[in-house]
Amino acid sequence: EAKKASFKKIIPILIEEACDELEQSYEVRPDEVAWIRKVLDYNVTGGKMNRGLMVVESGILLFGGRCTNDDLCRFAVLGWVIEMLQAWLWIADDIMDSSVTRRGQPCWYKVDDLGSAAINDAFLVEMLLFKALRRHFGDRPEYSRLVDLVMETTLQTELGQLLDIKCDTAPLSAFTLDRWTAIVKYKTAFYS
């Protein structure tokens, strides 16, 4: 629980950094910044955080438990990047699948009757995760590998989504164990 509490302390910082950058560098108005904060609060926080916490635990294991506070903070940032990746993919997935709830609450596109306007929010979350990566890893040698890893994971997940979507119109004979395995593998396995 202590690790989870430490992990949870990082996301408000990342959200604040993102909002500050949007205001200062992109002339985003306060009401729009408030909207983006709401998007991030609603979609990124509130889950079990298993993926993000696994990143922290993996980092600790890779460092043999000899981590500085800076290392732990970077692991947590990377964990939240994965949580943001999941969030933006879920926003889009819920729209495509006409889902009603996610994590026991209305899907984002159902909130305030957003509808397809939520697609832009998904794109914003995606771009903000890359901004967080640059902000916290941009001067580090592993930065380009992390960006490539996130992009590759995104592509694999989107290919899984394509397989899932194509099931809607595929004939029954197309539903094979191989196809199901590919959907499971590509839709969720790579960012989990």
Predicted region positions:
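Mg2+-dependent prenyl diphosphate-binding active-site environment of isoprenoid biosynthetic enzymes
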Residues: 26-192
